[in-house]
């Protein structure tokens, strides 16, 4: 059983023609219950996750000129374990076997990103983003030392960090008006996206 009830509020304000700020707050009430009955060991039980999440977000935009802008974003998010990750079933897969961990905890994420956007035209884009993420109780799949050899899931540390850069390009190869103006334009666009994460 998985129930998540959410509420969200946001406000946007333009201080000047160049500065825009957006504030948001999301509330999630999480209620997860997993019942299990492991035949091999005769183990029956259930596992529950009941949490209240308050998830703020902040986005600032500064327009350098008509074609260039800077954006700064900060937010909090989370990751919940899947049902198979928190129940002690043994899963037999094609490439590996795995078993859940009833003691697994959700992960909290604190996100920060800085983005530069350049719009040569209203429908074209070149952007560069630098991002950083702090993860509390990160979840990872690990190998368990045993005769059978299987994988399980653990909160592998108190915290972990992820950082990187991302480049996005969206370019119109051609734009041609159609004979009937009501149908807009025929166009062919090329999109490229690449990331470096460390």
Functional labels for PLM-detected ranges:
Residues 1, 39-47, 97-102, 150-157:
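Extracellular loop and loop/strand-boundary signature of outer-membrane beta-barrel proteins
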Residues 3-5, 50-54, 108-112, 159-165, ...:
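Residues that define the transmembrane beta-barrel architecture of outer-membrane proteins
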Residues 130-134, 151-198:
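Gram-negative outer-membrane beta-barrel transporters
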Residues 18-21, 67-70, 122-126, 175-179, ...:
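Repeated loop/turn-to-beta-strand initiation elements of outer-membrane beta-barrel proteins
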Residues 7-13, 58-62, 114-118, 130, ...:
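Residues on the lipid-exposed face of transmembrane beta-strands in outer-membrane beta-barrel proteins
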Residues 31-36, 66-111, 130-152:
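Surface-exposed extracellular loop regions of Gram-negative outer-membrane beta-barrel proteins
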Residues 1-65:
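Signature of Gram-negative outer-membrane beta-barrel scaffolds
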Residues 7, 23-29, 70-76, 116, ...:
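Transmembrane beta-barrel strands of outer-membrane/channel proteins
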């Amino acid at each position: 059983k998985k129930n998540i009830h959410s509420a969200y509020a946001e406000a946007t304000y333009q201080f000047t023609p160049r500065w825009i700020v957006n504030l948001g707050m999301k509330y999630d009430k999480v209620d997860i219950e997993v019942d299990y009955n492991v035949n091999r060991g005769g183990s029956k039980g259930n596992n529950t996750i009941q949490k209240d999440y308050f998830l703020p977000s902040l986005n600032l935009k500064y327009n350098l000129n008509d074609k260039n802008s800077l954006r700064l974003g900060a937010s909090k998010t989370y990751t919940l374990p899947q049902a198979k990750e928190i129940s002690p079933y043994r899963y037999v897969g094609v490439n590996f076997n795995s078993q859940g961990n009833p003691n697994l905890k959700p992960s909290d994420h604190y996100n920060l990103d800085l983005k530069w956007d350049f719009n040569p035209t209203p429908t074209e884009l070149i952007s560069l983003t630098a991002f950083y993420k702090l993860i509390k109780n990160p979840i990872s799949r690990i190998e368990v030392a045993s005769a059978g050899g299987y994988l399980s899931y653990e909160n592998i540390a108190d915290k972990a960090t992820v950082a990187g850069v991302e480049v996005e390009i969206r370019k119109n190869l051609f734009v041609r008006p159609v004979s009937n103006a009501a149908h807009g334009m025929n166009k062919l666009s090329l999109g490229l996206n690449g990331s470096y994460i460390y």
